Amino acid sequence: MPATPFDSVHLSRLFDAGETARLFTDSAEIRAMMIVEGALAQVQGAQGVIPELSAAAIHRASLECQIDPVSLARATGANGVSTPALVAAFREAMQAPEHAQYLHWGATSQDIQDTGLMLRLRQALTGFVAQLDQVLAALAQLAQTHAELPMAARTYGQHATPTSFGAQVASWGWPLLELRADLQGLLDAGLPVSLSGAAGTAAELGADPAALRAALAAKLGLRDPGRSWHTDRARVLRIGDAVTRMALALGKWGEDVTLATQSGLAELRLGGAGASSTMPQKQNPVVPSAMVALARHAGGLNATLQGA
């Protein structure tokens, strides 16, 4: 069995990350870092930091060269990060040492990895917003349809006062609506580029490193943070917090549905999934249970991220 269910073939549909999964593979990480290297060379060539001919060659190679993740494993194990191995493999793949010598000029590993991560997170957050729009539209329709359908509200698992199923559905949607606004706010503010060099001073990046950083941000569609953020992970933590809150809101939804489908209540009935191997009368709340499990998993990961 794989170490995590996300790497399992037979569990892949139970914990299906959909299109998001393709953004967090070795190949996607390498491709994002190569895009950053190519864009960096372009802006350095435009500002005279490296020869324009070499800049064009590096940018073209960043779009054409293919780097096998397996080829980076040994050097990454020795160096602790993958960027040195990637740069070496990239230079070799270019087969033009007169131009390849200017690859990664003045940058440091963290610049390339952080900026590549922001490119992938921007795609992920954009996807989350689109998915939330679909979920919210479905919840709105369900809440409107059942606005007058009475049911018992519960506190501490006990009957409280009358409510409606439409109100229950709306309670699932409100946190997601706020999270949708928060995620869009992160995108509107712009995810930050990183270009500060080995010690965060940008001393190796030419006569005007601030202009170079701003140009790289514009080229990649990212935001210029105006400074180094090598040791300030607040930006990453804010993204992690928003995604965790989304998982927790979905987990609460899953808990409510699991409660409402249990024997003796049967306030809700799910679709045809959730079969038992020995008890044909059962219809297990599989998807709601997965939502709860993922919420708990996300909370633990966020705690790890906060301490990283």
Stretches found by the model and what they are:
Residues P2-S196, A202, D208-A215, A275-S276, ...:
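A helix-coil-helix interface module used to build multimeric assemblies
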Residues A234-I239, V287:
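Membrane-water interface at loop-to-transmembrane-helix junctions
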Residues R31-V36, L237-S263, E267:
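Structured ligand/cofactor/substrate-binding pocket environments in proteins
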Residues H297-A308:
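Long, amphipathic alpha-helical stalk/connector segments used for oligomerization, subunit docking
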Residues A214-H230:
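A short, charged helix-loop
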Residues R91-A93, G254-T258, A295, G299:
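Short Ser/Thr-interspersed hydrophobic loop/turn segments at strand-loop and sheet-helix junctions
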Residues A266-N284:
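Acidic/histidine-rich catalytic neighborhood
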